Amino acid sequence: MRTRVLLLLLVLASHSALAASGDPLLDLAALKGQVVYVDFWASWCAPCRESFPWMNHMQEELGRDGLVIIAVNVDHEHSDAEHFLREHPARFRVVFDPDGVLPEKFGVRGMPTSFLIDRDGRVQSRHAGFRLTDRDSLAQQIRVLLHAH
């Protein structure tokens, strides 16, 4: 049951979380059949400065194969997130959850924390933190899921 809960909550939380464009958070139908990497981040998070270039690279390299990266910002002040994004542009979907609905539901205790979700909507892994040495392992996990079908 919990395996599909993350995607469902991402959709249900759309009333309190907005995409960077101001549109509702997500369209569940658009995620069907995709491998989804959900990353919780904040402007004050030092490792997030390292993860954003990696996520840009992964989205660019594997997006056409079915990877969707969604970065969920938890800053209380939208301006803090905007300042971070000016310094570290995102070429993937960014949503804002200043009320912390999603991190609370998933027990996120630190930033960044990521979840890797397979094409069937099941959470396959959870990863706390981000170090440059994590890149290869995370990329391999994503590639395995992309080629599982």
What are these regions (language model features)?
Residues 5-15:
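Bacterial N-terminal signal peptides
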Residues 18-36, 59:
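A short beta-strand-turn-helix
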Residues 34-36, 40-44, 110:
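Short pre-active-site segment immediately N-terminal to redox-active cysteine/selenocysteine motifs
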Residues 39, 69-71, 115-116:
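Hydrophobic beta-strand core positions in alpha/beta domains
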Residues 40-57:
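Conserved redox-active cysteine motifs that mediate thiol-disulfide chemistry
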Residues 82-120:
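Short, internal strand/loop/helix patches
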Residues 118-149:
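Thiol-/selenol-based redox modules, centered on thioredoxin-like
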